[in-house]
Amino acid sequence: MAAPVCVNIQMLLEAAEYLERREREAEHGYASMLPYNSKERDGLKRKSKSKKSSSSRSTHNEMEKNRRAHLRLCLEKLKMLVPLGPESNRHTTLSLLMRAKLHIKKLEDCDKRSVHQIEQLQREQRHLTRQLEKFGVERTRMDSIGSAMSSERSDSDREEIDVDVESTDYLTAELDWSSSSSSVSDLDERESMQSICSDEGYSSSGLKSIGLQNNPKSIAL
């Protein structure tokens, strides 16, 4: 009973190795039809390990080459960004990185100051905006008060003009009446003077006639 179980386990192991080998061969682009014995299998494993190690070394070398090329490119760009002074060619990678660190710190400080100034300017802008709105409301109120006062002033001016016109008319009527009354009084005075004069003339002529009648001698003379 134990022998068949061992045989089955061995067959399963060989089948598993066969499938694993086929998968590896499929990955590398070649296939084998028959299973190998243990020696051949060990030789293939060593060869595959050596191939893997060589391929991994070449891959690592290629990656390292690309990494160094990228690092050189980044260092050249960093030299253009960081102020190094007149002796920029003599700087090592370490000194370049240290200067870059200091430059970054300086830029961060400048950025903080700029942010603080921006916030302060924004606060001042909000304050000035509120002041401007307040002045606008105050100006509107003053304009309305000024327009009301000007309308009241114009109404009072019109009333004063009406009063002046009425007083002028009254004075004109007074002057006309006084002039007419004075002319009438002058006319009456002249008429009375004329009547008096006529009365005096009449009386003098009567007296003369009476005297002549009483003294006929004077008539003869």
UniProtKB/Swiss-Prot annotation:
PROSITE patterns: BHLH. Residues 193-221 have a biased composition (Polar residues). Keywords: DNA-binding, Nucleus, Repressor, Transcription, Transcription regulation. GO terms for cellular component: nucleus. Expressed primarily in cells that have undergone terminal differentiation including notochord, floor plate and cement gland. Its main location: nucleus. It comes from the Eukaryota. A motif (Nuclear localization signal) lies at residues 21-49. Residues 29-67, 178-221 are annotated as: Disordered. One of its GO terms (biological process) is regulation of transcription by RNA polymerase II. InterPro entries: bHLH_dom, HLH_DNA-bd_sf, MXD1_bHLHzip. CDD domains: bHLHzip_Mad1. Component of a transcriptional repressor complex together with MAX. In complex with MAX binds to the core DNA sequence 5'-CAC[GA]TG-3'. Antagonizes MYC transcriptional activity by competing with MYC for MAX binding. Binds to the TERT promoter and represses telomerase expression, possibly by interfering with MYC binding. PANTHER family: MAX DIMERIZATION PROTEIN 1, MAX DIMERIZATION, MAD. This is Max dimerization protein 1. It comes from Xenopus laevis. The lineage of its organism: Eukaryota, Metazoa, Chordata, Craniata, Vertebrata.
